[in-house]
Amino acid sequence: MDLPLDNRLSLGIQTIHRRTEPGVGPWLPEIDELVKLVQLVDRCGYDSMWVGDHVAFALPILDPFLQLAQAAVVSRRLTFGTGVYLLPLRHPGPVAKQIATLDHLMEGRFIFGVGVGGEFPKEFEVCGVPLNERGARLTESLQVLRTLWTGQRATHHGRFFNFEGVTMQPPPRQAGGPPIWAGGRSDAAVKRVARLLDGWMSYVVTPDMFRQGLDKIADAAGAIGRKFERGFVASHLLFTRVDKTYEAALEAATKSLSTRYAMDFRRAAQRYCALGRPQEVVETIRRFYEAGARHVILDFVGPYEERFDEIERFAAEAIPLLQDLRTAHV
């Protein structure tokens, strides 16, 4: 089957309060900085803002729900989302309430991106969740969310969670709850997307790998006869650096991502990042679009203090080169 993809390309920005890059001096998140950042992203014409999630990470990171609630006060236009939230680490009951609340506070401009995690096993240890249960917990948690979001008297009996006759009010602003997108490229992950979710969020893949992932989702959805009544969005989180030369961009990306992930990221940066002059970066984005990506989330890499300049530079020098895709007929 063919997935019901729109034609228009949307662009998002990853990260609000997060210090994961080499920087100067101590990192103390500031409200004024968040306000300026969200205003800048809105003014530059991007479509969305996203934050990641870790309970215990190599470098400082704040809770995504609290960041988004703070950011949503600043813009009445932008869509906000988690990219991605490690749902297996939490009980889905309180999460259902938090998401319903966020959806109302954002007036229905929220997308819930989820993932299984696993790269940092200590997160699972501190949350008391066996690492080998993360996939099964995610699947069941998604079912619990949808059940509670009906706003009706709900019952669920599963492997991990059990309740009977629970009514959670109010339900989310968006009928049926906000769209849920999921990351992952394993066979289990793509089958989960095909069966239960409204979108796919890829990460650290090439355009060819992206296309293969979408094909697997389409085949799995076709095998069970799923119609995607709410539509389907194919998205990609893309590490990006616009610079004077490809080599300068590669050096900045390597240093930044090696710090973030505590490993040598040079070869991965060469393969998976969009780097170089504006034309080179745009060409990479176009290849992802041709592979089926319709929402590209830009994670600008480089020194933390440069992110305002990176957001402005991309908007001024790269977005105009993508206008044909951004105004494509839906």
What are these regions (language model features)?
Residues 1-25, 118-122, 159-177, 246-272:
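N-terminal small/glycine-rich loop or linker at the start of catalytic domains
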Residues 6-29, 88-155, 203, 208-212:
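Flexible, glycine-rich active-site loops centered on histidine and acidic residues
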Residues 62-82, 137-144, 312-330:
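Alpha-helix-loop-beta-strand connector modules within alpha/beta enzyme cores
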Residues 28-41, 98, 182-192, 277-287:
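Short, acidic/polar
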Residues 11-15, 49-51, 80-82, 110-114, ...:
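Hydrophobic faces of well-ordered beta-strands that scaffold small-molecule active sites
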Residues 41, 45, 53, 71, ...:
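Conserved, mostly hydrophobic/aromatic
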Residues 1-74, 178, 301:
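N-terminal beta1-alpha1-beta2 module of alpha/beta enzyme domains
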Residues 17-32, 85-92, 174-185, 240-241, ...:
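Active-site mouth loops of central-metabolism enzymes
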